Curated annotation (Swiss-Prot):
Gene that specifies this protein: RPS6
Modified residues (Phosphoserine): 232-233
Protein family (similarity comment): Belongs to the eukaryotic ribosomal protein eS6 family.
Organism name: Debaryomyces hansenii (strain ATCC 36239 / CBS 767 / BCRC 21394 / JCM 1990 / NBRC 0083 / IGC 2968)
GO cellular component entries: ribonucleoprotein complex; ribosome
Keywords: Phosphoprotein, Ribonucleoprotein, Ribosomal protein
Entries under InterPro entries matching the protein: Ribosomal_eS6, Ribosomal_eS6-like, Ribosomal_eS6_CS
PTM per Swiss-Prot/TrEMBL: Phosphorylated.
Protein's recorded name: Small ribosomal subunit protein eS6
Pfam families in the cross-refs: Ribosomal_S6e (PF01092)
The organism's place on the tree of life at top rank: Eukaryota
UniProt GO MF annotations: structural constituent of ribosome
GO biological process assignments: translation
Signal peptide segment: none
Amino acid sequence: MKLNISYPANGTQKCIDIEDEHKLRVFYEKRMGQEVEGDTVGDEFKGYIFRITGGNDKQGFPMKQGVMHPTRVKLLLAKGHSCYRPRRTGERKRKSVRGCIVAQDLAVLALSVVKQGDSDIEGLTDTTTPKRLGPKRANNIRKFFGLTKEDDVRQFVVRREVVKGDKKYTKAPKIQRLVTPQTLQRKRALKAQKVKNAQQQRDAAAEYAQLLAQRLHERKAERAEIKKRRASSLKA
């Protein structure tokens, strides 16, 4: 069985192949999310504590959290479920997944380091892989660098170097939800336009109501005049 160990603190991961069944017994009958001591796995893992985050069997079927079964099962999955991505709106499909209990027929078991042990593991805890991209939203940039609302966020955007042929330049993401005098002016202009449109609609409605009342009054007067003429002709 292969152990795919990740170390989120450093952003690194390493895949280790273990053939001795006795070393793997500590993981059997354990569920996803449970923590396991790494002393029995090997001397280099002494003092380490791992959390089981997932795995898949030799046919590639992944483990699914919440399915209390050590073997493969078929479930009707929809949007929002793990181990399934719908291709159409409202689509559901019956898919084969493994339960969340670790069994012997797994090919790869995914682990995450919760507590570091006595010694470093080469390629896992002794190296650091920095994040390729920094935060993009204005509030997240402020939180990341500990800035106040008065500080200019645009000076602190994480830029990355790009090499294209002989040219070397830097790229920065577009800051989302950035409040600038220009955006505030646009907001005020939009609000003023809405108020203006509403006033125009009210004026048009009042003008139409006035015209309608005038037409009704004219029609009423016209009918009264016709009645008057008929009455006078009958008398004559």
